[in-house]
Regions:
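Predominantly flavin-linked oxidoreductase catalytic cores and closely associated redox partners
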Residues: 147-291, 349
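Beta1/beta-strand and adjacent pyrophosphate-binding region of the FAD-binding site
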Residues: 3-14
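Dinucleotide-binding Rossmann-like beta1-alpha1 core, especially the glycine-rich loop
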Residues: 44-134
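Conserved mid-domain beta->alpha element of the FAD-binding
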Residues: 314-379
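Long, low-complexity C-terminal extensions of enzymes
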Residues: 358-497
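Conserved FAD/dinucleotide-binding core of flavoprotein oxidoreductases
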Residues: 261-312, 332-344, 355-358, 362
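Glycine-rich FAD pyrophosphate-binding loop
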Residues: 25-48
Length: 497
């Protein structure tokens, strides 16, 4: 190949396939790049839902996906973060898609809060977060100039998966993507690279760059190219996941809720269409039938259409191998905690676009892509691992094993730095903001032993004044916000009209 790739062939299923196809086609069509999508059988069920992180909103905007139309067609909802509910002796805490506090005298808020807590402040960290407080009061938080000046006020989505994929397919059709359907494919190799994909009916689809979006099957990068995988299972206890759905809540909360049980955890994702349930557990501690009964008890809901599947966290040594780029779980499979799968798909696509080859020789782009994506995936893994390592959820066997699991060295370093002075050790390619890490550590019972001495220059009365100002801003701003249900109804109704 003399010039840059002009023919991209994507083999896969579900969101990984259709997000890859639509984003690459939309971005590269002006350069004359064609995209062919080979769709394998879906692995989704009626119970499946995609929970996003905030960056997906911007990706949708670039694709020309109208937010109100998407939420109406999918029956989706907004999410302002995750409420974590532990045992009775552990206070719930909120991981918000927004800032905790605002800077004081040019310094981040958190060390002032730590100092104040040492001197008896009763207000918890989330009291200073408009996003968390809006969610707890059943409201949506709409960004404006005041909230932008305060800090981040982001949101994400809960999207019923089958309907979301259908919406992406409509967009793909409008972009002129060539679509083929196959139950299985044969991968043709030439000089250790992929040259074409052969379908069961004899159709042969040649390409210059191939994308593996086939999920855990890793049809191209794993089965055909033999690219190895680093096993992350030693850091995670759960090896089975149960997904199910229940009837929608009468009032749809603007957040996910993770509930901790003795044998694992369960997350509820509320949408307009249904309540989607994800439950993670360890098969050596609980069989499938017992897990289903436990999930029903912990959720308090009648679970419909349960599906049980294995989970094997791990990452490809090289997500881009030869002329094949793996996207989604073909590249990296995560523990299901905090619903990062859709975000991982987006990370892979965005970095591929930023490093798309400019010539037929793309070894440099490939090496940089592998460095960046591996680093980004590891930072996401670290956030999940920290939840398990620091859990204070009692002496149940699952949580004992989680605390004893082999956490990555980066997690231990972050924990040690936080405990010493409340700081979050900065690392490249983070997906989660420092104050979200701090909220996680505080929520799990972490209390820094001290704070940076530079903040001692701020007089106590000045600190108190700023705390009162921030709490007043949060209270007033939240009271201005519409109820989440009402906002969803108005948004979807205006689109229908």
């Amino acid at each position: 190949m003399n010039g840059p790739p002009r023919q991209i062939v994507i083999v896969g299923r579900d969101a990984a396939l259709w997000l890859s196809a639509t984003v690459l086609r939309q971005a590269l069509r002006p350069a004359g790049v064609s995209v062919a999508a080979v769709e394998l059988p879906s692995r989704l069920s009626m119970s499946s839902a995609y929970a996003s992180l905030p960056p997906l909103e911007a990706l949708h905007a670039k694709l020309g996906l109208d937010e109100s139309a998407l939420l109406r067609s999918t029956g989706g909802s907004f999410s302002l973060g995750t409420n974590v509910v532990g045992p009775a002796d552990a206070a719930p805490f909120f991981l918000a898609h927004g800032s905790y506090g605002a800077p004081i005298d040019g310094t981040s808020f958190f060390p002032y809060w730590v100092k104040a807590r040492h001197f008896g402040l009763g207000a918890v960290l989330e009291d200073f977060c408009p996003t968390a407080m809006a969610a707890r009061q059943g409201r949506m938080l709409l960004p404006d100039e005041a909230t932008e000046a305060f800090g981040r006020t982001d949101y994400s989505y809960h999207l019923p998966a089958l309907a979301y994929v259908a919406a992406l397919k409509v967009r793909a059709s409008r972009l002129g993507i060539a679509v083929h359907h196959a139950r299985s494919v044969t991968v043709e190799l030439e000089s250790d690279e992929i040259s074409a994909i052969a379908l069961e009916d004899g159709t042969r689809i040649a390409g210059e760059l191939f994308v593996d979006a086939s999920g855990a099957d890793a049809v191209l990068i794993g089965q055909a190219l033999g690219e190895g995988r680093e096993d992350w299972r030693p850091a995670f206890v759960a090896d089975r996941i149960l997904t199910a759905h229940a009837t929608p809540f009468a009032s749809v909360p603007a957040y996910a809720e993770t509930r901790v049980g003795d044998t694992g955890w369960l997350t509820l994702h509320a949408s307009q269409a249904a309540t989607h349930i994800t439950c993670a557990f360890a098969s050596d501690l609980q069989d499938d039938e017992t897990a289903l009964a436990a999930a029903q008890t912990l959720s308090g809901l009648k679970l419909l259409d349960p599906v049980l599947t294995p989970i094997e966290p791990g990452c490809r040594g090289r997500p881009w191998s030869a002329n094949c780029v793996a996207i989604g779980s073909a590249a990296c499979a995560f523990d299901p905690l905090f619903d990062v799968d859709l975000h991982a798909i987006q990370l892979g696509i965005v970095h591929l676009l930023s490093l798309f080859p400019v010539s037929g020789e793309f070894a440099a782009e490939r090496a940089e892509y592998n460095r960046i994506t591996r680093s980004a995936f590891e930072r996401v893994r670290d956030f999940q691992s920290a939840f398990y390592a620091l859990n204070r959820f009692g002496a149940a066997k699952f949580w004992d094993a989680a605390r004893a699991a082999a956490s990555p060295a980066e997690v231990a370093h972050k924990i040690a730095t936080f405990r010493a002075r409340g700081d979050i050790a900065p690392m490249e390619d983070e997906s989660f903001a420092p104050d979200l890490w701090q909220a996680l550590f505080v929520g799990l019972g972490g209390v820094p032993e001290s704070w940076p001495p530079a903040i001692d220059r701020t007089p106590p009365e000045r600190m108190k004044e700023e705390f009162r100002r921030i709490l007043g801003f949060v209270r007033d701003k939240v009271l201005e916000q519409p109820a989440h249900d009402a906002y969803l109804r108005s948004l979807c109704r205006s689109e229908a009209a």
